[in-house]
């Protein structure tokens, strides 16, 4: 099920996306049109199988655009091939707690406007900023079809998908 803004993006096509993921898929489509140089799209969402979830979401949007006649089936084939577009799984040992009023106050004191913390009717707390703990470690599936920077020099661990999945537990 798509969020309403993403569903509207499917109807509008890749030329006028509004949702962040729709914008990303639109940029992937532009890359495809420009020759399809391989790329890795890395999710830093702190959830299990994040690469799979990101891939599935990107494909859902692209399939909607293909059904609507906005993109050719070749784009879906390109996007589906992990030698063209990979979605490495990752696991980050970092907790992002609820937004802190102290951080909101600090940002406001610095002159940043609109730092109000809100709570939805379902109890979800959100803010236009993120406060987080310092990262302890980052584990990435080493599947980058066009190469990657030497992030292991900064302490990132590269491994296979099975090891990333084990580290999630």
Model-found features: residue ranges?
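Substrate/ligand-engaging "lid" and interaction regions
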Residues: 1-169
């Amino acid at each position: 099920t798509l969020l309403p803004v993403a569903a509207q993006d499917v109807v509008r096509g890749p030329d006028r996306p509004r949702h962040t993921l729709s914008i990303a898929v639109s940029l992937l489509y532009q890359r495809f049109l420009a020759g399809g140089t391989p790329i890795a799209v890395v999710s830093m969402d702190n959830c299990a199988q994040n690469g799979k979830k990101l891939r599935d979401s990107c494909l859902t949007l692209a399939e909607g655009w293909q059904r609507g006649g906005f993109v050719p089936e070749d784009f879906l084939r390109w996007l589906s091939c992990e030698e063209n577009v990979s979605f490495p799984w990752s696991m980050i040992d970092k907790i992002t707690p609820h937004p802190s009023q102290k951080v909101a106050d600090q940002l406001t004191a610095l002159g940043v406007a609109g730092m109000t913390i809100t709570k939805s009717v379902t109890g979800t707390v959100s803010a236009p900023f993120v406060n987080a703990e310092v990262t302890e470690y980052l584990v990435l599936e080493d599947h980058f079809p066009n190469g990657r920077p030497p992030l292991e020099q900064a302490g990132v661990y590269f491994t296979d998908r099975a090891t990333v999945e084990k580290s999630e537990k």
